[in-house]
């Protein structure tokens, strides 16, 4: 009985670990920085990573709702398919 519980616990732990590790290994997570005014500006800033986009996030600042724009870069620098060809 205890071996069944231990093995199922290990399997569950391994599955959670794998689900957390996959996005980090693939490099598909986007890095976001504060202060985006437009998507073209963000694209230029993120050119080496395959482009980017402005993303608005709603959060609380000093007890009030605040909307802040972030520049989120696509992390496609290791992918030969998604990377733009620069001459």
Swiss-Prot record:
Entry keywords, A to Z: Antimicrobial, Disulfide bond, Fungicide, Plant defense, Secreted, Signal
Chief place of localization: secreted
Cystine pairings recorded for this chain: 32-73, 36-54, 42-71, 46-72
Signal peptide: 1-27
One cellular component term from this protein's GO annotations in UniProt: extracellular region
Subcellular location: Secreted
One of the GO biological process terms: killing of cells of another organism
Protein family according to the UniProt entry: Belongs to the DEFL family.
Name by which UniProt lists this protein: Putative defensin-like protein 84
Taxonomic lineage from the root: Eukaryota, Viridiplantae, Streptophyta, Embryophyta, Tracheophyta
């Amino acid at each position: 009985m205890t071996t069944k519980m231990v093995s199922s616990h290990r399997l569950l732990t391994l599955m959670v670990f794998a689900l957390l590790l996959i996005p980090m290994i693939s490099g598909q997570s986007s890095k976001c920085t504060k202060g985006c005014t437009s998507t073209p500006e963000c694209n230029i800033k993120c050119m080496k990573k395959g482009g980017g986009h402005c993303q608005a996030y709603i959060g609380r600042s000093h007890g009030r709702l605040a909307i802040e724009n972030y520049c989120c870069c696509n992390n496609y620098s290791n992918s030969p398919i998604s990377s733009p060809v620069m001459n």
